[in-house]
């Protein structure tokens, strides 16, 4: 056990020297990116040893050796939890980050601030590892906020572009909403459990109230871009492609799912939270799949596929299977990073063209990228014996066998079918057919820093699922025998999506429809959600805020102070200073009656 913990500690501390060297020597040399990449690669190799030892020993370890602060009732210490989730995730995150950094050497070669870019990527990785290994909520919150601020810095990397700055601000604002839930849970647990350690919280609050659980669900929805807090995820594509690959594969977007996995022992006893998680994930996975079906930006298609897979992970947690959700996190990291790399390779070679309608015929000119893109898309769709199949097939089988919401299960199956449809559509429009880009485009994919990381991730997309599945057991054993039609459900919906994509491609080529349907506009405009929330609602709010004070000022105060006040003063003055009432008949009668009385007396 000592060797196990020592090797893990060495893995985590090996990533710190490249950051410290920038403090000592700010004027970094051109070799700094290669140095950072080599450190991450070496750390990945080192991390395999403690992970292998952990699989053999099968014992969790908690390292707690430095006290941060001590109050009268609470003791806060630096604590690392080395269990299935952290020990399996560390090598996956390091492997994917290593490949992305090597890819960045090619993609960001001409960037003048490439050294700072690599430093940001490394800090991004470190904050995610802090989040994964944290054994108390405060330490987890440090990693949580760390990935948030690093995503802001990396999305706005090209700060001269207004869209990049807007996307970065959008990401940080949506995550602030989720952070409200996290801080609410922090406050509740310290008040009721007097601790932020998950073990103590589970012992003292086996059935906590809905308040902290709803806070954790809100935090996960914000960080993992669930429906309602999702618009920042496709907008984050304004950042460089390596940032998109790291953001969507093994760092920020899976942090929310990982939070729910960590606190699943508290949430599993609450049927309401489980149902909310299930329904939120199901709606998200369907909505994202529908939006991806009609997008034309290759990076946004992959981004919406990430949102759809995050919804599927939420569904898995909702059916009380956190181990399967974690399995899907690990398998998803390989082919999602590779899909972004292939997209970046295509975009870079086509002179920053991202519209798939202006591509085509790349299978012959970019064979390795095309092959890897096909493997990644098929793995995303859940094609048998690729990495994605091992997790998606288990998830769908478990959902079919669970006493769960039939509505949520149905739309999850529809979303799985649509995943196959938009993956096939991307392959057909990008790689097949006649070239639709300028003929003088110089395409070259012979750079080793481009090919090697894609090859590694392609191997991971082929074999990683089989290797990881054998080391992650579900929380409860599967039913040993199930009907054949349930066993083939995942395969059936995958092939149904494939046929749907072929049919849509045929309709597009033959122009069977002269004008798009309303459903097309709903899908292409992302359900009109950004237009309503980012344009209409703020406009109405600002218009109301403008009109209300103006009307109050004009109709109330200005009119009351000047015209009405003067009029009231004049009326009151005339009433006080004058007894003339304007009653002529009464005045005449009052004059006439004394005259008559006088005449009567005289006579």
Swiss-Prot record:
<keyword id="KW-0999">Mitochondrion inner membrane</keyword>
<feature type="transmembrane region" description="Helical">
    <location>
        <begin position="144"/>
        <end position="160"/>
    </location>
</feature>
<keyword id="KW-0867">MELAS syndrome</keyword>
<dbReference type="InterPro" id="IPR018393">
    <property type="entry name" value="NADHpl_OxRdtase_5_subgr"/>
</dbReference>
<dbReference type="GO" id="GO:0009060">
    <property type="term" value="P:aerobic respiration"/>
</dbReference>
<keyword id="KW-0429">Leber hereditary optic neuropathy</keyword>
<keyword id="KW-1274">Primary mitochondrial disease</keyword>
<feature type="transmembrane region" description="Helical">
    <location>
        <begin position="272"/>
        <end position="292"/>
    </location>
</feature>
<dbReference type="GO" id="GO:0042776">
    <property type="term" value="P:proton motive force-driven mitochondrial ATP synthesis"/>
</dbReference>
<keyword id="KW-0249">Electron transport</keyword>
<feature type="transmembrane region" description="Helical">
    <location>
        <begin position="407"/>
        <end position="429"/>
    </location>
</feature>
<keyword id="KW-0679">Respiratory chain</keyword>
<dbReference type="InterPro" id="IPR001516">
    <property type="entry name" value="Proton_antipo_N"/>
</dbReference>
<feature type="transmembrane region" description="Helical">
    <location>
        <begin position="482"/>
        <end position="502"/>
    </location>
</feature>
<dbReference type="GO" id="GO:0042542">
    <property type="term" value="P:response to hydrogen peroxide"/>
</dbReference>
<comment type="function">
    <text>Core subunit of the mitochondrial membrane respiratory chain NADH dehydrogenase (Complex I) which catalyzes electron transfer from NADH through the respiratory chain, using ubiquinone as an electron acceptor. Essential for the catalytic activity and assembly of complex I.</text>
</comment>
<comment type="similarity">
    <text>Belongs to the complex I subunit 5 family.</text>
</comment>
<dbReference type="GO" id="GO:0005743">
    <property type="term" value="C:mitochondrial inner membrane"/>
</dbReference>
<dbReference type="InterPro" id="IPR001750">
    <property type="entry name" value="ND/Mrp_TM"/>
</dbReference>
<feature type="transmembrane region" description="Helical">
    <location>
        <begin position="122"/>
        <end position="142"/>
    </location>
</feature>
<dbReference type="InterPro" id="IPR010934">
    <property type="entry name" value="NADH_DH_su5_C"/>
</dbReference>
<feature type="transmembrane region" description="Helical">
    <location>
        <begin position="87"/>
        <end position="107"/>
    </location>
</feature>
<keyword id="KW-0431">Leigh syndrome</keyword>
<keyword id="KW-0812">Transmembrane</keyword>
<dbReference type="Pfam" id="PF00361">
    <property type="entry name" value="Proton_antipo_M"/>
</dbReference>
<feature type="transmembrane region" description="Helical">
    <location>
        <begin position="38"/>
        <end position="58"/>
    </location>
</feature>
<dbReference type="GO" id="GO:0045271">
    <property type="term" value="C:respiratory chain complex I"/>
</dbReference>
<keyword id="KW-0496">Mitochondrion</keyword>
<keyword id="KW-0520">NAD</keyword>
<feature type="transmembrane region" description="Helical">
    <location>
        <begin position="325"/>
        <end position="347"/>
    </location>
</feature>
<feature type="transmembrane region" description="Helical">
    <location>
        <begin position="211"/>
        <end position="233"/>
    </location>
</feature>
<dbReference type="GO" id="GO:0015990">
    <property type="term" value="P:electron transport coupled proton transport"/>
</dbReference>
<feature type="transmembrane region" description="Helical">
    <location>
        <begin position="458"/>
        <end position="478"/>
    </location>
</feature>
<feature type="transmembrane region" description="Helical">
    <location>
        <begin position="301"/>
        <end position="320"/>
    </location>
</feature>
<feature type="transmembrane region" description="Helical">
    <location>
        <begin position="171"/>
        <end position="191"/>
    </location>
</feature>
<feature type="transmembrane region" description="Helical">
    <location>
        <begin position="582"/>
        <end position="602"/>
    </location>
</feature>
<comment type="subunit">
    <text>Core subunit of respiratory chain NADH dehydrogenase (Complex I) which is composed of 45 different subunits.</text>
</comment>
<dbReference type="Pfam" id="PF06455">
    <property type="entry name" value="NADH5_C"/>
</dbReference>
<dbReference type="GO" id="GO:0005739">
    <property type="term" value="C:mitochondrion"/>
</dbReference>
<protein>
    <recommendedName>
        <fullName>NADH-ubiquinone oxidoreductase chain 5</fullName>
        <ecNumber>7.1.1.2</ecNumber>
    </recommendedName>
</protein>
<keyword id="KW-0813">Transport</keyword>
<dbReference type="GO" id="GO:0008137">
    <property type="term" value="F:NADH dehydrogenase (ubiquinone) activity"/>
</dbReference>
């Amino acid at each position: 056990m000592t060797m196990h913990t020592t090797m893990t500690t060495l893995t985590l501390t090996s990533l710190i020297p490249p950051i410290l060297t920038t403090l000592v020597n700010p004027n970094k040399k051109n070799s700094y990116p290669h140095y950072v990449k080599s450190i991450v690669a070496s750390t990945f190799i080192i991390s395999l040893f403690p992970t292998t030892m952990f699989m053999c020993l099968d014992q969790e370890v908690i390292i707690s050796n430095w006290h941060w602060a001590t109050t009268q009732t609470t003791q806060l210490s630096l604590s690392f939890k080395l269990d299935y989730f952290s020990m399996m995730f560390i090598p996956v995150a390091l492997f994917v980050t290593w490949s992305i950094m090597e890819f960045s050497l090619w993609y960001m070669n001409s960037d003048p601030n490439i050294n700072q870019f690599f430093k940001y990527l490394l800090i991004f990785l470190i904050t995610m590892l802090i989040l994964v290994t944290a054994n108390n909520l405060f330490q987890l919150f440090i990693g949580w906020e760390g990935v948030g601020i690093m995503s802001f810095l990396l999305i706005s990397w090209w700060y001269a572009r207004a869209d990049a700055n807007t996307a970065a601000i959008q990401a940080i604002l949506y995550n602030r909403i989720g952070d409200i839930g996290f801080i609410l849970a922090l406050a509740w647990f310290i008040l009721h459990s007097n601790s932020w350690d998950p073990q103590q919280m589970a012992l003292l609050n086996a059935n906590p109230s809905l308040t902290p659980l709803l806070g954790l669900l809100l935090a996960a929805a914000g960080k993992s871009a669930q429906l309602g807090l999702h618009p920042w995820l496709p907008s984050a594509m304004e950042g460089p492609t390596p940032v998109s690959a790291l953001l969507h594969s093994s760092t920020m977007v899976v942090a929310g799912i990982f939070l729910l996995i960590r606190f699943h022992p508290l949430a599993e006893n609450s049927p309401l939270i489980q149902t909310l998680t299930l329904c939120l994930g199901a709606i998200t996975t369907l909505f994202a799949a529908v939006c991806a079906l009609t997008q034309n930006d290759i990076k946004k298609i992959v981004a919406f596929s990430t949102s759809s897979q995050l919804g599927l992970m939420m569904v898995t947690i909702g059916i009380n299977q956190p181990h399967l959700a974690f399995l899907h996190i690990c398998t998803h990291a390989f082919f999602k990073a590779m899909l972004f790399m292939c997209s970046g390779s295509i975009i870079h070679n086509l002179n920053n063209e991202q519209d798939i309608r202006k591509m085509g015929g790349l299978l012959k000119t970019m064979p390795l990228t095309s092959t890897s893109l096909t493997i990644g898309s098929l793995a995303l769709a859940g094609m048998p014996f690729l990495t994605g199949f091992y997790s998606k097939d288990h998830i769908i089988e478990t959902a079919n066998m669970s006493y769960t919401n039939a509505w949520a299960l149905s739309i999850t199956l529809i979303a799985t079918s649509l995943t196959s449809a938009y993956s096939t559509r991307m392959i057909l429009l990008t790689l097949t057919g006649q070239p639709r880009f300028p003929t003088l485009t110089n395409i070259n994919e012979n750079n080793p820093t481009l090919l090697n990381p894609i090859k590694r991730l392609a191997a991971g997309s082929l074999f990683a699922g089989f290797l990881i599945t054998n080391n992650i057991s579900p929380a409860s054993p599967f039913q040993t025998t199930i009907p054949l039609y349930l066993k083939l459900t995942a395969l059936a919906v995958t092939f149904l999506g494939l046929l749907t994509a072929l049919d849509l491609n045929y309709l597009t080529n033959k122009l069977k429809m002269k004008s798009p349907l309303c459903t097309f506009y709903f899908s292409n405009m992302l359900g009109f959600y950004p237009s309503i929330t980012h344009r209409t609602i703020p406009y109405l709010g600002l218009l109301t805020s403008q009109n209300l004070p103006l009307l109050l000022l004009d109709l109330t105060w200005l009119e009351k102070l000047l015209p009405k006040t003067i009029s009231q003063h004049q009326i009151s003055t005339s009433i006080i200073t004058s007894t003339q009432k304007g009653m002529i008949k009464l005045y005449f009668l009052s004059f006439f009656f004394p005259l008559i009385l006088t005449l009567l007396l005289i006579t």
